[in-house]
């Protein structure tokens, strides 16, 4: 693995956190727990930056070998090397934490913390030189997603969040800013993001996305994590995927939650195991879920 720079990092003032109406012992416990989380979030930001630098060494290069996995999804050396880098760094820094990733076997957790990693979400975009692919790192604590990082290496852009600390957005060398989902209340004014038609047809759900498209103002096929990041940063109201693995959605759940929105499965449940996913604003959630919940179920769900 090549040496890489530490990258962007945000340091939170954990010592100044206050928890009203709590005993001193409980405040200390909560402060300790929050410190553990924010240490991990800061490290996740570093890891996403390091992985992104590695990925860009392969981006838009001649002769990039693209293989097909068992499910026919593409994978490259950049996918594998980036996840391996993340796993190796995690083993050194947080050896008791578990890791669930797309490219390698699971590592069980010994302390309740688990990292859920997709080194390149949007490998097809990456392979074809489209900059909308991202590195996703989610942090789970006792089965709850508590922090997430979504970094777009080719655009030098990152969206991240941790429980109780808001959702933040940073582009290149600009100052980071806190971000929120749009306040749109009328679905006819909404902007919809969706993924490639192949998945909609293969799951028998093409008519479902058409039903949502008929309701909104604008529909664009900017899929994968980029579409969901658009919702978190106030540039879209709805992003829908008919197929999502745990590593596709894990980082997005806390990001959307802290941005004031929702990232759930099509039944409206906040879970990494639903098999599908939607990011949506609070005002439009019930309308969108009402449509999605009528879709044909995924096999085994």
Where does each model-flagged region fall?
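A cross-taxon signal for low-complexity, glycine/charged-rich
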Residues: 1, 7-10
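Short loop segments at secondary-structure junctions
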Residues: 140-144, 154, 163-166, 172-173, ...
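Residue-level signal for inorganic ion chemistry
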Residues: 55, 79, 90, 123, ...
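N-terminal subdomain of lithium-sensitive/metallo-dependent phosphomonoesterases centered on the IMPase/IPPase/PAP
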Residues: 25-120, 283, 287, 293, ...
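DPxDG-like acidic metal-binding loop motif
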Residues: 109-168
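Acidic active-site catalytic centers that drive phospho-/nucleotidyl reactions
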Residues: 73, 79, 83, 102, ...
């Amino acid at each position: 693995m090549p040496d890489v720079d530490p990258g962007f990092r945000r340091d939170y003032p954990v010592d100044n956190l206050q928890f009203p109406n709590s005993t001193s012992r409980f405040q200390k416990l909560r402060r300790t727990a929050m410190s553990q989380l924010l240490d991990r979030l800061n490290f996740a930001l570093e890891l996403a930056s390091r992985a992104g630098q590695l990925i860009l060494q392969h981006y838009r290069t001649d002769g990039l070998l693209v293989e097909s996995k068992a499910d026919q999804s593409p994978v490259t050396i950049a996918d594998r090397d980036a996840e391996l880098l993340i796993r190796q760094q995690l083993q050194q820094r947080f050896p008791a934490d578990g890791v669930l990733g797309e490219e390698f076997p699971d590592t069980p957790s010994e302390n309740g913390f688990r990292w859920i990693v997709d080194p390149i979400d949007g490998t097809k975009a990456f392979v074809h030189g489209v900059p909308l692919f991202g590195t996703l790192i989610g942090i789970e604590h006792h089965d709850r997603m508590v922090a997430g990082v979504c970094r777009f290496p080719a655009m030098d852009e990152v969206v991240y969040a941790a429980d109780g600390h808001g959702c933040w957005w940073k582009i290149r060398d600009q100052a980071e800013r806190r971000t929120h989902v749009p306040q749109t209340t009328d679905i006819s004014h909404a902007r919809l993001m969706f993924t490639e038609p192949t998945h909609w047809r293969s799951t028998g759900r093409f008519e479902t996305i058409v039903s949502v498209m008929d309701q909104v103002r604008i529909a664009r096929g900017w899929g994968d994590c980029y579409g969901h990041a658009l919702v978190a940063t106030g540039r879209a109201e709805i992003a829908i995927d008919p197929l999502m693995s745990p590593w596709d959605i894990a980082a997005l759940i806390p990001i959307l939650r802290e941005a004031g929105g929702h990232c759930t499965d099509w039944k409206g449940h906040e879970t990494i195991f639903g098999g599908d996913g939607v990011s949506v604003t609070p005002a439009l959630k019930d309308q969108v879920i009402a449509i999605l919940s009528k879709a044909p179920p995924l096999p085994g769900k």
